[in-house]
Amino acid sequence: MTQANLSETLFKPRFKHPETSTLVRRFNHGAQPPVQSALDGKTIPHWYRMINRLMWIWRGIDPREILDVQARIVMSDAERTDDDLYDTVIGYRGGNWIYEWATQAMVWQQKACAEEDPQLSGRHWLHAATLYNIAAYPHLKGDDLAEQAQALSNRAYEEAAQRLPGTMRQMEFTVPGGAPITGFLHMPKGDGPFPTVLMCGGLDAMQTDYYSLYERYFAPRGIAMLTIDMPSVGFSSKWKLTQDSSLLHQHVLKALPNVPWVDHTRVAAFGFRFGANVAVRLAYLESPRLKAVACLGPVVHTLLSDFKCQQQVPEMYLDVLASRLGMHDASDDALRVELNRYSLKVQGLLGRRCPTPMLSGYWKNDPFSPEEDSRLITSSSADGKLLEIPFNPVYRNFDKGLQEITGWIEKRLC
């Protein structure tokens, strides 16, 4: 046997890791119109994943770094699941999405280990955590390599928290009928207990993706932030997303009187995208425990119930929805029927009067969240505020919108 053949035999993978785009087997819609959204990025020809530059830059990644990693993926001549899609390289090797972003994360992890300045080291660890999360994106169930990247992200995040300003505590919450879940409580400088925002994130993000929100908007106002992962991902991976989408967050809310660092009489919820579905449910079901609920680009009715709206949404996002619902090989018709049950209007909540103050921010022509969803939320509240966020310039208006939202929350908490 030649040396080359021997090497191939010795280092031949024992099994192939599933490639991300193959994990959800739905009937495709075919050609789709291009999509651009402030919170979700945009569809780019020849990419399975939506490229979410705004949010990645907002989380601290340099635009040039994003382009460098994308270039490595594009230039790979390795085998792909779909030759027309750059980010479908099979196996953990050069050109594979998870491999390239995790490799980039390791560069920053090494910088963090070598850096003697604790605060700068913390910044490098945070950068690595963010890159590992991008490696795992969009966090589909059963993506073994992505789950390993998520674990590395959580480890890097814990290292970062030990070195950055303020205090972070990892907390475990008991949920009857299943496994406990883990959350992170971020606390500003000073003496607690602190007014606290319970973060309800999007379905394609991890709880560790929201440090920028805490550092830039809540901490300067003396507000703590508590995060948990959405059902079926991260530390909540043993829980499936159900129509009772707020189940985990409700149990966390009920546990807050026993958390000494949290002023449980001054708690608000903040929901991004599908996280707004959770936050608005909390506004109705746990109104005595909440001072306010804020939403950004909420997914509470139209996308869940309108077939035309669903047709405008990229394949990747529908795959995320199917994955969270545990419908990996369901037909599109079955998925549509199930999604309809998650509409808060269909559930009989939205449209009824809600005593909790609610704000909802939206962008015009948002394919995921039309203005009507935000109007439905704010008109249902006894104290509602509707906030339109202009699209361009996208980064500046995103920051301005978050400043206004956190200011609104502060007035109701402090």
UniProtKB/Swiss-Prot annotation:
Give the InterPro entries listed for this entry: AB_hydrolase_fold, FrsA, FrsA-like, FrsA_esterase
Q: Which reaction does it catalyse?
A: a carboxylic ester + H2O = an alcohol + a carboxylate + H(+)
- State what this protein does: Catalyzes the hydrolysis of esters.
Q: What class of enzyme is it?
A: hydrolase
Say which family it is in: Belongs to the FrsA family.
The reply on keyword Chaperone is no
Report the protein name in the record.
Answer: Esterase FrsA
* Superkingdom as given in the UniProt entry: Bacteria
Q: Which organism is it from?
A: Escherichia coli O139:H28 (strain E24377A / ETEC)
Q: What is its EC number?
A: 3.1.1.1
User: Which terms in the Gene Ontology molecular function aspect does this entry carry?
Assistant: carboxylesterase activity
Pfam families cross-referenced by the UniProt entry: FrsA-like
Q: Which key words are in the record?
A: Hydrolase, Serine esterase
